[in-house]
Amino acid sequence: MVLIHTSVGFFKRFSTSATPSTSSASDWKTQQTLFRVATEISSILLQRRNWITHLQYVKSKLPRSTLTSPVFLQILRETRKCPKTTLDFFDFAKTHLRFEPDLKSHCRVIEVAAESGLLERAEMLLRPLVETNSVSLVVGEMHRWFEGEVSLSVSLSLVLEYYALKGSHHNGLEVFGFMRRLRLSPSQSAYNSLLGSLVKENQFRVALCLYSAMVRNGIVSDELTWDLIAQILCEQGRSKSVFKLMETGVESCKIYTNLVECYSRNGEFDAVFSLIHEMDDKKLELSFCSYGCVLDDACRLGDAEFIDKVLCLMVEKKFVTLGDSAVNDKIIERLCDMGKTFASEMLFRKACNGETVRLWDSTYGCMLKALSRKKRTKEAVDVYRMICRKGITVLDESCYIEFANALCRDDNSSEEEEELLVDVIKRGFVPCTHKLSEVLASMCRKRRWKSAEKLLDSVMEMEVYFDSFACGLLMERYCRSGKLEKALVLHEKIKKMKGSLDVNAYNAVLDRLMMRQKEMVEEAVVVFEYMKEINSVNSKSFTIMIQGLCRVKEMKKAMRSHDEMLRLGLKPDLVTYKRLILGFK
């Protein structure tokens, strides 16, 4: 009786649609064949070293030479005690037996790797699962199909760590919440990875809450954990708490670095140098980046005494060689890449004011780009003028584009800056079109029409499209001032870019064109046809066209427009419509 029950249970796993009691004789035969094939493959895997050769003979016994998930799961159960063999067979089956694992098979093979301590292999197997499915599906399926709690905890920790290292802390927190509900604790490595991800995104409060959970779960903090906690405390300005932490015997170069940068940001340079001397006594070295931060803060606060002190230290540590031009260039460019524009600008000015040192052309470009990114527009303008005056050749076009973007970002830009923007654009360096549109709209709102026209003219020949609001304001201005030729040029530009304007702006153009009587009727018809093409018409558009066509005695065209208006359901109010009909008499 027991044997019969086992066979039935096995065959049920292999069956896709029918139960043993209702399946045909041929179905039973197929199930028995699959049972024997699974057992044969398991025996070969467990008993043969060169099992790949022997499996070639079994391949033909599989339906269409394809391994299915139920057969694989049976093999996995029988070979689980030899995890490396099971995992190698999994890879072999995908390559040679057309095996396409379902979520259950994937989860079970990950569990085999995790429970046997093959974490790198488990991580590799997890990656495609995590990359192609949602967090809820991944953790839900793992919870459903894993048989052991320990292996589930290990595998979910790997999932959490994967998300954290990818910078997706939201997904990492979702996995963490799921594990808490299951009363599972992530590994120390997973905790540290998620902490690091939260710190990187400046989520300090959440990070401290996570650390509290880590302590409650009995996870012992390691050096990386303490470094991250010290960094959080320093970012929050809680340097005294960091010193209390250090009094317990916890200290590292990273903790000292965080403290130095914390004091430096607050302008407490005496404390900075005291810490640096303490580090020297303990044979701990600050990095170039940390010295760069201190120098940048000293330059930002204009503390000449400490600027000289930091420079002397950097010379002593061989980070800076004040007389070497090539070294200066590299240092300035490195500081620019770090975003330390006050320090890089100070060294840049020193080099420019000296007679013996000549900077590379690329250094001017780096300086222009860094100042522009930090929204220090006035200083960026000075560097740009210096580049033009000295005839410097900057090959990196992104430097000029970043400068143009900075000029667009400046809400209180002067006329000089607006002229510079036009100059940069004419040289072929076009900023972000969204920002450019905002500048144009701002000029129009402030009624600085000449500046707006200059800006528009500078990009008219380029493949640049302003948004409809900015162009609409300028179009209405052209119509009010009678500059219909410019209005038509702008329309052609928009048409070429397959853009559109607000219907009110188009109506203003139609109205002005029709007021010219017969002179510009054809132009009005062309504009109107484009309006219909882009579905930017309303009742007023048709009214303007019909009245204008009636005035120039184009009665057939007027009637066609009238009929089209009615067909589209754009009939105006009764008073306007009666006035419109009078034009046909």
UniProtKB/Swiss-Prot annotation:
This is Pentatricopeptide repeat-containing protein At4g21170. PPR repeats lie at residues 152-186, 187-221, 222-247, 252-286, 287-321, 324-358, 360-394, 396-431, 432-466, 467-501, 502-534, 538-572. Gene3D superfamilies: Tetratricopeptide repeat domain. One of its GO terms (cellular component) is mitochondrion. The keyword Nucleus does not apply. Belongs to the PPR family. P subfamily. It comes from the Eukaryota. Pfam families: PPR, PPR_2. Keywords: Repeat. The lineage of its organism: Eukaryota, Viridiplantae, Streptophyta, Embryophyta, Tracheophyta. PROSITE patterns: PPR (PS51375). The keyword Repeat applies.
